[in-house]
Amino acid sequence: MLFRSYWIEDYDKFYVTWATNYLPEEFNFEDINYPREDKIYFSGNISAHGRCENYSTFAPFIQECEKNNIEFIHNDPFSNPLSEEEVILRTKKSILGVDIRGPEHIRNGYVPCRVFKSISWGHLGTTNSPEVFKELEGNCLFSSDTGQMFYVAMEKRTDYEYIKQAMLYVQENHTYVNRIKSIMSLL
């Protein structure tokens, strides 16, 4: 019965994925060469419980970081909100900018902003989400095994031409300018 109360007859829906927060002209391809630290700064939710549990997918990745002397530094935005500038800075200086989805996000095909932002900030796009990989048309690395993802990403993280192509793809297809154009095309 709850479903019926939200049903609207003859109403078309428009679904839009997230995008990077950069406008196309803000992309700086020199960010590919940004000095990286042997650390990963992750600003986002990591939860061991609930519907959006994602610790089970982060744990293997974090273990491989530790085995390889890469410090994984987590900032919970709910207990310690950072400015957008600080999140960008921390991501840029990270050795990797990864997008790791939990089981529920994988199941429902959630496409977050994180991967688009990481790529636009000069990082190799890396994800465990088949839907994200599909949305980026292969312009990122994919591994369902997040422990193995660490090694795949570390090996490819200095493939600057690949990263540049991914940045160009996001610049042309995944900014809010693209989202606005998509909406306008329906009017």
Say what each PLM segment does.
Residues 7-14, 18, 59, 73-187:
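Catalytic binding pocket for nucleotide-activated donors in carbohydrate/polymer assembly enzymes
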